[in-house]
């Protein structure tokens, strides 16, 4: 029996709907259920072919469990190793290298020393910072936002250096980015599932939270724009290796700028995304999970330490060093 586990937190609608959908597909040899955990023994197999992770970003115990599960061949959506290492600033840089449009963005030193550090810990920092250069590169309006995290927490729109410093001085020890504010005519949030399926949703980030998904979901203003959004969304998720993600685009002068695309546990509650979007994402994730469960994939084989699990191996660098010592 191939088991698909769903690991979740405060969500009320998506997890049970996903389990019900998978089991309702009646695929021979496949069953979905909620993951139940106690103390986890090291190197113990999880018993799951696939785990859909909706909460480990908030619970370190769950993240450690998922890494242990991946070690034994469980396919975890999304990859807990990359998710742990990822951040939004790196994503912006990577996207730029991939040809995806990104507004000018700068990462900034912490406004206050992180806990356990002093000014002596910061001796590699320029002081004072060349703020004029930063503002000239980014421009105004701009958004000051954390280099990691989500949910629109600690995000501030600033229209001048004075507004910037007012908000920056309240960010404490958070690591922040400053990104040029796109004056968008259209805005879209896209579900990207299995690095293959894209569902474009008209979105209004300025509206109250429960009204942000535009009713009727009108399509992008042109076929060319729709094609570009789909292409860039897939490019980003394939490069990042995310099988369940949302990508947000702000469209200015016909150019879709990728604004936010590190959402490996994206909102999928029916009360916020609406019935049609909810039905689409439940169906797409269910089919992806079943396909992965039946695929025979072993993600552990792609990781750096996988070779060591197959038996004694020599690291190339160590091998070369040994030969050099012999010659000496």
Would you name each region that the model predicts?
Residues 2-8, 70-73, 81-187, 216-223, ...:
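Active-site nucleotide/adenylate-binding loops and adjacent lid/helix of ATP-dependent enzymes
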Residues 9-121:
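Conserved N-proximal alpha/beta basic substrate-recognition cap immediately N-terminal to
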Residues 11-12, 57-58, 83, 149-150, ...:
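Short, solvent-exposed loop/turn segments at secondary-structure junctions
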Residues 44-48, 253-258:
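A short, glycine/Asx- and small/polar-enriched loop/turn
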Residues 51, 77, 143, 246, ...:
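Generic enzyme active-site microenvironment
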Residues 56-57, 262-278:
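Glycine-rich phosphate/pyrophosphate-binding beta-alpha loops
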Residues 172-175, 181-215, 230-246, 250-257, ...:
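Phosphate-binding core of ATP-grasp and ATP-grasp-like enzymes
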Residues 209-257, 283-297, 301-319, 323-327:
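A long amphipathic alpha-helix within ATP-dependent nucleotide-binding catalytic cores
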């Amino acid at each position: 029996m191939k088991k698909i586990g769903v690991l979740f937190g405060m969500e009320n609608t998506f997890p049970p709907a996903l389990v019900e959908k998978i089991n309702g597909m009646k695929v021979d040899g496949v069953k979905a259920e909620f993951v139940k955990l106690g103390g986890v023994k090291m190197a113990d197999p999880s018993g799951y072919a696939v785990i859909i992770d909706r909460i480990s970003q908030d619970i370190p115990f769950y993240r450690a469990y998922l890494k242990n599960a991946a070690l034994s061949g469980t396919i975890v959506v999304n990859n807990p190793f990359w998710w742990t290492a990822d951040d939004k600033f790196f994503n912006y840089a990577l996207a730029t290298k991939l040809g995806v449009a990104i507004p000018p963005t700068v990462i900034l030193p912490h406004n206050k020393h992180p806990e356990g550090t002093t000014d002596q810990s910061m001796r590699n920092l320029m002081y004072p910072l060349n703020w004029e250069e930063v503002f000239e590169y980014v421009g105004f309006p701009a958004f000051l936002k954390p280099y990691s995290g989500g949910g629109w927490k600690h995000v501030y729109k600033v229209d001048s250096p004075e507004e910037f410093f007012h908000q920056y001085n309240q960010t404490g020890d958070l690591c922040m980015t400053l990104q040029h504010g796109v004056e968008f005519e259209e805005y879209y949030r896209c579900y990207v599932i299995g690095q293959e399926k894209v569902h474009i949703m008209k979105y209004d980030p300025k509206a109250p939270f429960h009204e942000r998904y535009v009713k009727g979901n009108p399509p992008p203003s042109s076929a060319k724009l729709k094609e570009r959004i789909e292409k860039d969304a897939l490019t980003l998720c394939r490069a990042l290796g995310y099988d369940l993600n949302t990508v947000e685009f702000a469209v200015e002068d016909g150019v879709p700028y990728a604004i936010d695309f590190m959402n490996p546990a994206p909102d999928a509650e029916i009360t916020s995304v609406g019935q049609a979007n909810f039905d689409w994402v439940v169906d797409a994730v269910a089919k992806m999970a079943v396909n992965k469960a039946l695929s025979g994939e072993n993600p552990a084989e792609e990781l750096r330490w996988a070779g060591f699990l197959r038996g004694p191996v020599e690291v190339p660098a160590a091998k070369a060093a040994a030969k050099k010592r012999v010659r000496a």
